[in-house]
């Protein structure tokens, strides 16, 4: 439907990601909260994903591993803060390869006429941390994820 917008506010330790999906917020939320669906779209398209733990509730923890075609593994973990809903999914995010460099992601979903705007604000501990994440190839992973999520959403049926 639309391209992904990635904004790096100058001098601020944030990344703002926005993308519209031709799907109701309920489906976009479901794709974010069900581990089996999450594994089908999150991350660069050439990587496979294994969800080890995904407790989408206040205080719940999560951990997943991306594996590249070369077998190299990249593990990530975090904690949910508050009850995840379309009004907000708040969670920490840490790449285990760089422990201690934790960011806070706040994702909101706004639906209008069957189109959902997904907006994620990632707050880093410093501009240097943000810039290191961007330099690691984050943009390609974010764009691949958006395209893969759009394709997945087209296959899902809303639950009434």
Each model region followed by its residue ranges:
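Hydrophobic pocket/interface hotspot
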Residues: 28, 38, 62, 80, ...
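A short, structured loop/turn motif at beta-sheet edges
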Residues: 25-26, 56-57, 81-87, 108-117
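Hydrophobic/aromatic beta-strand elements that line small-molecule binding cavities or substrate pockets
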Residues: 19, 51-54, 76-82, 93, ...
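Short, solvent-exposed aromatic-acidic interface loops
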Residues: 69, 94-100, 121-128
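Intrinsic-disorder/low-complexity, polar/charged segments enriched in Ser/Thr/Lys/Arg/Asp/Glu/Gln
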Residues: 12-18, 49, 61, 75, ...
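Short beta-edge strand/loop motif at the mouth of beta-sheet-based domains
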Residues: 16-17, 36-73, 160
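A conserved amphipathic terminal alpha-helix motif
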Residues: 125-160
């Amino acid at each position: 439907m639309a391209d992904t917008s990635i904004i790096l506010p100058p001098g601020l330790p944030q990344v703002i990601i926005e993308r519209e999906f031709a799907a109701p917020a309920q489906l976009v939320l479901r794709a974010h909260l069900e581990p089996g669906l999450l594994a089908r779209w999150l991350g660069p398209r050439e990587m496979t994903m294994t969800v080890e733990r995904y407790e989408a509730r206040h205080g719940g923890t999560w951990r997943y591993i991306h594996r590249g075609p070369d077998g190299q593994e990249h593990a990530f973990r975090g904690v949910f803060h508050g009850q995840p809903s379309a009004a907000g999914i708040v969670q920490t995010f840490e790449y285990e390869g760089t422990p201690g460099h934790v960011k806070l992601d706040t994702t909101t979903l706004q639906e209008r006429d069957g189109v959902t705007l997904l907006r994620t604000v990632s707050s880093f501990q410093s501009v240097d941390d943000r810039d290191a994440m961007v330099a690691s190839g984050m943009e390609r992973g974010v764009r691949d994820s958006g395209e893969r999520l759009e394709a997945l959403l087209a296959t899902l049926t809303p639950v009434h």
